[in-house]
Amino acid sequence: MILLLRFTSGCPQVLSTPYFYFSYTLDITHTRQRLDSLRFCFVEIMKPFNKWLCRSAEFASQSLLERSEKRFVWNLSLLQPLMANQSLHRYALPVIHGFVSINPATIAGTRIVWTLVSRRSTQRVGTRLFVRGGDVDGHVANFVETEQLVEVGGSTASFVQTRGSIPLHWQQRPDLRYKPPPSLESGVGEHRQCFSRHMEEQVRLYGHQVMVNLVDQKGAEGRLEARLRAVAREVNNANVTYEAFDFHAECSKMRWDRLSILMDRVAVVQEQQGFFLQEREGSFLMRQTGVFRTNCIDCLDRTNVVQSMLARRNLQAVLRRLSVLQEHMKVEDQTVFEGLFKNVWADHADMVSIQYTGTGALKTDFTRTGKRTKMGLLEDGRRSLIRYYKNNFADGFRQVSVSSHLPFIVHAINQSNQDSLDLFVGNHTVSPTEGVTHESPLAPLQPDQRYLNHLSHMSTHPSPTLSPQNTNTRYMAAPLALLLCLAMLTLSLAVPAELTTEILLSVLFWAG
């Protein structure tokens, strides 16, 4: 019963987060290049990066779940009971979490299908300020694989990018400050191990890595950047290129045109990495030999802007290669499609942000219009306030996601540092002291005597301090009071009194 309560309280919060996708026929967990590599034998193509096995016959006979990329299957643990029975495999459809947008369009008189797909990893899940950095296995928070697909006359092009939290041991716990300072954990050796394992895995999966780090190079973020730069230099992986760009400093005072500095710096390597291109009859013409791995502190707002710019430049190259655009033509000049491109990338930014923070992305006015606007700044302010509230007053419940009237279970969950997302995707790790010094969150279904006594006492002596309604009210009191003060302050300014003194007194009263 206790276990049932934990899951019933946590799973709806996970499932209500947009969006989950599945397909009856397509391998949506794979990029086109990865799918092509698994379907056929291309052992030599990606050396020394990808060590694909030649298993085309085995691949063709497997179900969608069996041949899926397990990093992106969010219902993998739920489908395990079906895996033992071959006749049930057709019902075991892998589900991804992220973003999908399929858009027929016309460019220069040619019909194309432009698709954007993002897949969130299940290997280090959690909410914004509660799950940061990497773990001992090299898995990082908010890791998302984004693929841009272009289909023209039977030919298909694919361009893949990734994002993920800074691969070091660090955290940024909410403390009621608007921007809690990130803090490094562990020693230099642990940071090196986390970075090394993460990057080795990324090189194996995607090829050469260009780490585009957009965090501030001063202050608290600057300490993270300095440590990451030092660790990257120490590890000295020949297949990893580190590219730091202080987004806020370079683009201060709304000088967003200065992003061209970064784009010029990475232009050559983007051309060298190329993209995947497959002809109508199935033969490939090009393969992507590396990816851009972009991050900021959240891997959201700044990351979205840069990824959309890299995607636009790739789209330009693809359309010219497929003879949709002539050499003198630009994607930006295709007015209708350019509007579609900007809006889809902005919608993508919002969705990835909602999944990690609970609000839409910041700076999407630049993605939608190509420039920063005053209305965009106001919208960023509104979303920042919502983020502040959710990070400090709501995400803790989502992270722990247990009934507030079971205090000893709350303690057990906190001790084991597990959340509803980890339980949902099957990532719960048993600690050596679990069940000894503290109760396991995956304890047997039989409730112990403490729980039975607790329920009996609650039924005869309801305690207001332990009721969910009272707990929610207690946590809602501070933000509601703040909102009331702000509302009254706004009203006082909007409806002035006859005397200036009365206005000032009203402002001082409600602001205080």
Locate predicted features.
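A phosphate-binding catalytic loop at a beta-strand-loop-alpha-helix junction
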Residues: G290-M309
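Phosphoinositide system proteins, centered on phosphoinositide phosphatases
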Residues: M1-L285, N314-G512
